[in-house]
A protein has these predicted regions:
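Acidic, metal-coordinating catalytic segment for phosphate/diphosphate chemistry
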Residues: 1-41
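Active-site-adjacent beta-strand/loop module that shapes the phosphate/pyrophosphate-binding cleft
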Residues: 102-131
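Conserved Nudix-box catalytic region and its N-terminal flanking loop in Nudix hydrolases
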Residues: 45-87
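A short coil-to-beta-strand element that immediately follows conserved catalytic motifs
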Residues: 17, 92-102
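A generic structural micro-feature
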Residues: 34-36, 112-118, 134-139
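NUDIX/MutT-family hydrolases
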Residues: 133-164
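A short Gly-Trp-Pro
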Residues: 67-72, 121-123, 155, 159-168
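Conserved hydrophobic "DFG−1" position in protein kinase catalytic cores
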Residues: 44-45, 52, 124, 144
């Protein structure tokens, strides 16, 4: 956010970033808050296996990820889960069967801008493993991995690593 200098209201080069969440103009008192964006991630389970995706774009290209993404305006977290799973994997779910597990803060760096996110983790059970029709612009492949074989070093995002540390140790 340090790269933004010109005020969108008055046009002067007087825009200042407070280092955390706010841009403000010294000239006209314009204020723009850079609030948290909501994002969803879905643990799709079949027995003791979890479906993970491999990212085909930055950030975290080539790393493992849970299916999900950002919520759209006027969309519930459950609706975002259903939309993202349809977009990324071409599967349809019953949103009422999602179980919310945990929320964690995260920083999502995109094109040299850090976006603060609140990642909302859900669980969704399926009776049998499935093949997905992938949106290769987002997902290069899927893998069904036994939960005790998940390597946290291969997970793309810190919030998901923290999530899996808690999730995988939930019964201990």
């Amino acid at each position: 956010m340090d790269e933004l200098h010109f005020c969108p209201k008055c046009g002067e080069e007087t825009l200042n970033w407070d280092g955390e969440k706010k841009l403000s103009c010294n000239q006209c008192s314009f204020v723009l808050y850079h609030n948290c964006a909501a994002a969803v991630a879905v643990v799709i389970r079949c027995g003791n296996e979890i479906m993970l995706t491999k990212r085909s774009q930055e950030p975290g290209k080539g790393k493992l990820d849970l299916a999900g993404g950002f919520t759209d305006p006027k969309e519930s977290a459950e609706e975002a889960c259903a939309r993202e799973l349809k977009e990324e994997l071409d599967i349809e779910i019953i949103p009422e069967n999602l179980k919310i597990l945990l929320t964690l803060p995260n920083i999502y760096r995109y094109k040299d801008i850090d976006y603060n996110t609140l990642d909302i983790f859900f669980e969704y059970h399926v009776d049998k493993k499935f093949d997905a029709k992938l949106d290769i612009s987002e997902v290069s492949e899927i893998a069904w991995i036994y939960e005790n074989e998940i390597d946290l070093n291969e997970i793309a995002f810190n919030s998901q690593k923290k999530f899996f540390q808690k999730y995988l140790n939930r019964n201990q």
